[in-house]
Amino acid sequence: FDAGNARDWDDKLTIEVGSPHAALRSIEISRADDVPTLFIAGDSTVTDRDSGPDVSWGQLLPRFLKPGIAVANNAQSGETLKTFLAALRLDKILSQMKAGDYLFMQFTHNDSKASWPQSYVEPETTFKAYLEVYIAEARRRGAYPVLVTAMNRVNFNAEGKNTNSHDGYPE
């Protein structure tokens, strides 16, 4: 099993207990098909992280939602709109998506790296075209696409002012 490759995902639930002193006596899991699922697609700024101190908004989001909403965080560090498709991550989401679900999308951090030609997504054309695919596929299934603006990197110019690290990408 390779967690970095959607082709290796299966329909099994894996539960990891991180403390050597933790104990689990029993667990009962039942499918809740009647609740909306909020799917998350994105990069390291959204993905679930194994250990702190860094956390992403994607892994904290469930704390702020009312009961009765499932969250499926499919984000992965290093992903772009292009590589998320190539790794079949969007296919994984779409295979589980139903009417009334949500698709939250936050990309840009890696898309904007022109030094990564295999994953670079040009802001004025390709980036928008990929977003249109994600949006159309979610809508085709009766889900609600939600575009989340990428947070700015902390980059300072010579005058000590923070600069826009995602210049040219939609906000």
Predicted regions and their residues:
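Extracellular carbohydrate recognition and processing domains
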Residues: 1-3
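Serine-esterase "nucleophile elbow" of acetyl-processing enzymes
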Residues: 5, 12-76, 91-103
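Gly/Ser/Thr-rich beta-alpha loop segments that engage phosphate groups in nucleotides
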Residues: 44, 80, 110
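Acidic/histidine-rich helix-loop elements
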Residues: 48-53, 73-87, 114-122
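Alpha-helical cap/lid subdomain in secreted, periplasmic
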Residues: 60, 88-171
